């Protein structure tokens, strides 16, 4: 009984103190991903336009660059401007985990951490991309991660509305999505 109370108290703490994270009961949903995904067209620079806030991204002006590695995997370079004005960057590696669904990638930033799902739900390769990730904990709750990316620092409102519709039509909660201001950001990729 004491163990159950401790577990419930811990879970309650997670749900109430994790700023921005999107915790939900049940396992991760499995939304459809981009059909006929072409990773080579996806390579290059992307700007973070909107996202569900995550504990590992605290800065602004977030940009990502994807490039092909010699081993066939994808180098991921994320950069952000910290609140104190310094530049923070993290480098990782992504790979296609299932060639029958090439838009389902796994990304790993630190060797001691397991790879995380990185699913491209939608992209036109030239202007927008919708990325979804989810982690299930203890088989009965999950955390959603969402990124709306643009090839330019701005996306038209109708594009953002369309991408949010994809999320909601797949039972992915968008209530905590925030807009990331890319105005007056340095070009650091």
UniProtKB/Swiss-Prot annotation:
The modification Pyrrolidone carboxylic acid is found at residue 21. The keyword Iron-sulfur does not apply. GO terms for biological process: brain development; glucose metabolic process; lipid metabolic process; lipid transport; negative regulation of cytokine production involved in inflammatory response; negative regulation of focal adhesion assembly; negative regulation of lipoprotein lipid oxidation; negative regulation of monocyte chemotactic protein-1 production. PROSITE patterns: LIPOCALIN (PS00213). InterPro entries: ApoD_vertbrte, ApolipopD, Calycin, Lipocalin_ApoD, Lipocalin_CS, Lipocln_cytosolic_FA-bd_dom. It is found in: Secreted. Disulfide bonds join 28-134, 61-185. Residues 1-20 form the signal peptide. SUPFAM superfamilies: Lipocalins. Its main location: secreted. GO terms for molecular function: cholesterol binding. The keyword Nucleotide-binding does not apply. Expressed in liver, kidney, bladder, adrenal, cerebrum, duodenum, testis, lung, spleen, pancreas, heart and skin. GO terms for cellular component: cytoplasm; cytosolic ribosome; dendrite; extracellular space; neuronal cell body; perinuclear region of cytoplasm. Glycans are attached at residues 65, 98. Keywords: Disulfide bond, Glycoprotein, Lipid-binding, Pyrrolidone carboxylic acid, Secreted, Signal, Transport. Homodimer. APOD occurs in the macromolecular complex with lecithin-transport and binding of bilin. Appears to be able to transport a variety of ligands in a number of different contexts. Belongs to the calycin superfamily. Lipocalin family. This is Apolipoprotein D.
């Amino acid at each position: 009984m004491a163990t159950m109370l401790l577990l419930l108290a811990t879970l309650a703490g997670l749900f109430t103190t994790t700023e921005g994270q999107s915790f939900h009961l049940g396992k991760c949903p499995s939304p459809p991903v981009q059909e006929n995904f072409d990773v080579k067209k996806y390579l290059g620079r992307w700007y973070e336009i909107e996202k569900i806030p995550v504990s590992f991204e605290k800065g602004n002006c977030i940009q990502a660059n994807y490039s092909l590695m010699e081993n066939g995997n994808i180098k991921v370079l994320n950069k952000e401007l910290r609140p104190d004005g310094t530049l923070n960057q993290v480098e990782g590696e992504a790979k296609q985990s299932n060639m029958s669904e090439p838009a389902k990638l796994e990304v790993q930033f630190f060797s001691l951490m397991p790879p995380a799902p990185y699913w491209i739900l939608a992209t036109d390769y030239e202007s927008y991309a919708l990325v979804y990730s989810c982690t299930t904990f203890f088989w009965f709750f999950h955390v959603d991660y969402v990124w709306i990316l643009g090839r330019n620092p701005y996306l038209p409102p109708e594009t953002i509305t369309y991408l949010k519709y994809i999320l909601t039509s797949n039972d992915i909660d968008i209530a905590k999505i925030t807009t990331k201001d890319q105005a007056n950001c340095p070009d650091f990729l």
